[in-house]
Amino acid sequence: MPNAFANTLQTFQAGPGRSGQFYSLPELAKLYPNVRRLPMSLRIVLESVLRNCDGRKITAEHVEQVANWSPTASRTTEIPFVVARVVLQDFTGVPLLADLAAMRSAAQRLGKDVGRIEPLVPVDLVVDHSIMVDHYGKTDAIDLNMKLEFRRNKERYQFMKWGMQAFDTFGVVPPGFGIVHQVNLEYLARGIHQRADGVCYFDSLVGTDSHTTMINGVGVVGWGVGGIEGEAAMLGQPVYFLTPDVVGFELTGKLREGCTATDLVLSVTELLRKHKVVGKFVEFFGEGTRSLAVPDRATIGNMAPEYGATMGFFPVDERTIDYFEGTGRTRDQIKFLEAYFRAQQMFGVPMPGDVDYSAVVKLDLGDVTPSLSGPKRPQDRIELGKVAGTFRTLFSKPIAENGFNQQPEVLLTRHQVESELQTAAPVPDNPPTRLAAPRYEVEMEANKPTLRASHATSVPPVEGGDITIGNGDVLIAAITSCTNTSNPGVMLAAGLLAKKAVEKGLRVQPHIKTSLSPGSRMVTEYLRDAKLLPYLEQLGFALAGYGCMTCIGNSGDLTPEINEAISQSDLVCAAVLSGNRNFEARIHPNIKANFLASPPLVVAYAIAGTVLKDLMTEPVGKGKDGKDVWLGDIWPSSDEINKLMKHAMNPKGYRNSYGKVKAEPGALWQGIEGVAGDTYSWPTSTYIAEPPFFEGFTLEGPPPLPAASAAAASKEAVRDARIIALFGDSITTDHISPAGSIKDTSPAGRWLQEHGVVKTDFNSYGSRRGNHEVMMRGTFANVRIRNLMLPAGPDGSREEGGLTLYWDRQGGSQKMFIYDAAMKYISEGRGTVIFAGEEYGTGSSRDWAAKGTQLLGIKAVVARSFERIHRSNLVGMGVLPLQFQGDMSWQALGLTGEETIDIVPDAQLRPQSQAEMVIRRPDGTRQEVKLTLRIDTPIEVDYYRHGGILPYVLRQLLAG
């Protein structure tokens, strides 16, 4: 069907002899004048809807709905958004590739053309999640860490190489080039695309990582989705989402001397969390926004998940052009981009009154002060001068008040650490909580990969003689994460601070684990060119690798004797890192206090050695002459930083660096041998296995949904289900599907051992996401998760770990792993349900949290609220998400886990309709409760009825 708005297809000029066609928003505005008042981010979405209007997936009504967007309307309509491309990281990319391979296998079994299973948009997988800080502090650390990385992940990398040759549009940026979001910003982002027929359109994307929003800093619409939704997007399906509110964020003034982009983003995060922007677009405007360079904008966009927004968007302007020039895009590309944005009348940052927003938040940049965030949440900003005092206060506060529940008199106690390597008692995976610690139902956030990876290196003993450690001591100091290492201003500041510190004779104690793990090779190039890298190395910040590393918990272990001292004395030690998340135990299981800081402050705290020192009123340390050295003595000025910026904005350097992705990917990557063929042969492997989602797959989908019938309602109902878990608030996707270490006594550990894998080769759950046998056994296996079905102890404590009570048909119960109970219920033909509190599924965009739930036979999750991506993923796997109404909760209903549950949704499965839950208790009584069905859009109804998004998409592809 021809586009109903074909008259909007216009031509624009981009210089002599260069022109392009485009679907013109100014032309559309003649029909819908409201378009001229739309936020810039929504205009990019509108262009996609307009261009892809085919009368089937996207209709003229969809175009009209977006064009007539009202800032304060109720949000009930969905937008079908076709993205230009998809980006992946390796922990989420490998299972996604396994699903694509399984689709081809299913097509082959049906005698269909496997070539129909092909990404219809460019897909780039950047390998960044697998390298760990095993070695650090020395110049050969990166080489040693990469060799270990390749040894641990050989099978995964072989599978990626198969994908590269099997799919025409699937590319891989090999290990050692950087972090997906920084590589996206510096290399993959184009600003605009052009089809073979000459039609140009905005760059846009989704990524299978929550911090995909970093790309918003260059005016590209994009956000994080689960792997399931990402697969649908790459196979040509629109990304469906409810029409959003767009919150305008007006920045005024300018940053004061000594403040950094990190200080700014921590202030923005704190402010927007208070304004509750979950599920909304945030768009920055105003004079202050115009003044920000793209790296500063990208830092703010990166942390959109931390302030809860779907995006933190910055429109394209002269600063964007400067950045594209400085990072090696060609002059022709940049001219074409600018001409296109001007033709769309979208070049430039809006000023107050130019655009209509749902609400406006304001911040004067001059009010921003040097800050850290922590010690447990990124939104808990602390002014630099208050860090020490805040730590002292929290030290003795109850855990429920964000404290550490310690006795105040032990705060300053020091503990001896022997320097010689001893055989230390292993730190338990499930350490008992102190009896005095209060218990509460808010689960901790711990999205971290493993410390106990295969082929782990033995950590060397503490150097430099016996030491003492105590509460507040900094034991990990990491310049890490794309959030900050993408920003030359703060990286040069760190190098300059290190230079001044070394020149004054300051040093870092050798027992502090220091590391530098930037998001691209260009960072070390410009630090080297500016002659600053040697000073960082002298303070222990030697290059450890290019990847996420400490930011995602790949910090490696501490020395055995330090671990033992922390564990035996229950010390509250600290990590200071330039990352974006600091949830408890994320960075290291024995480090309880984690602070986010700018790279120069990371270096400063490494020198100070403790967060109990007030760096505003106390010296950082003593110099070589024995004199006190203050932070002001070594803090670089903005003039000093700006003089070195030429080294960072080096177009030739960026082109040379990223030119090696294909030309010189490295000997380690070239040494990986991938298999050939259009379909994968699924050799026996504990890393990669054909997922079961297409077993018994047929081309026949569900029958058309009748207008209303009891039979239809009955078919979708959950009957006589058992409760498998009762959870509290803030259950994260890491609780549901951990990325970290695999216990040998867990169901996954048992399975690996049964298949010949020794404990030292377990690697992590994150690295084994290509094998459903491991992952389904690892679902709800986080050692810190608390199933409140289990009875409380005499002191009120709750047992931790993936356990439940299995109820047999005679009414008897038995404690066992959730996986084992789930398999028993499946064998009996009984479904199961989960009950939870607020923010169920918060944290990382982890599709296995939904896949594992489905494979355990769980039919529904009933919660007080859901995180956006996980709710979508549950629907995408055919699991019903349902929400309590009003103040209702499972606690208010008095559920214990002994009950059986019926859930009957609306007969038509209308989005956000009412469902009826019937609770049957052991005493024969029953109770009816109204729930809200959290299938939010019509397309999600189709996904659910097909058994999930993957069967739906495969039927679409093979029926075409």
What are these regions (language model features)?
Residues 1-960:
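Fe-S-dependent hydro-lyases/dehydratases of central metabolism
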